[in-house]
A protein has these predicted regions:
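Noncatalytic partner-interaction/assembly domains of nucleic-acid and motor enzyme complexes
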Residues: 1-111
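Extended, charged alpha-helical coiled-coil/arm scaffolds that mediate oligomerization and mechanical coupling
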Residues: 45, 74, 85-153
Length: 154
């Protein structure tokens, strides 16, 4: 990475917010998202925390709205870790359309896969630049296995 021109990993704050806002506004949208996303797919740490709180509430058949999510978050995190109640309200207010939540979720997931590929690529490049106790065929096998693990998630 060039210090003068750092590359930001692929992400979309808008898509992440739209997924979260859609879930806050219409809990039934969970059915469209549950098999697409996990909290690890979110780039923003605050969005991971919010998503985990929503999931916890919905899995326990509790409503997930800005108040209940905030209360769930503060059970294990500082409220400031998600930008506070105001940020939750902004997410809900700025959600463009709940009906497109599946498309937003797929976009968030796709960007997550790109980030995973970048991470693996960097790991493989680092290992190839200084191959400590690893044969080239072993590195190829390791690379193939890691990429296959990502492919299985799709």
């Amino acid at each position: 990475m060039d210090i003068d021109n750092p590359k930001i990993p692929p992400n979309s704050v808008d898509s992440e917010q739209s997924v979260l806002g859609g879930l806050l506004l219409h809990n039934e949208s969970w059915d469209s998202v549950v098999n697409i996303l996990s909290s690890d797919d979110f780039y923003q740490t605050s969005h991971r925390i919010i998503y985990d709180a929503i999931v916890t509430l919905l899995e326990h058949d509790k409503p997930a709205d800005i108040l209940t999510v905030k209360e769930q978050v503060i059970k294990s995190h500082d409220e400031d870790s998600i930008g506070g109640f105001t940020y939750l309200a902004q997410i809900a207010e700025n959600t463009p359309s709940v009906s497109n939540i599946e498309a937003y979720a797929k976009h968030v997931r796709e960007l997550s896969i790109y980030r995973q590929l970048i991470k693996i690529g960097k790991e493989m490049a680092d290992t190839a630049f200084s191959p400590k106790d690893i044969e080239v065929n072993d590195l190829l096998d390791l690379s193939e296995r890691k990429i296959f693990e990502i492919a299985e998630q799709v």
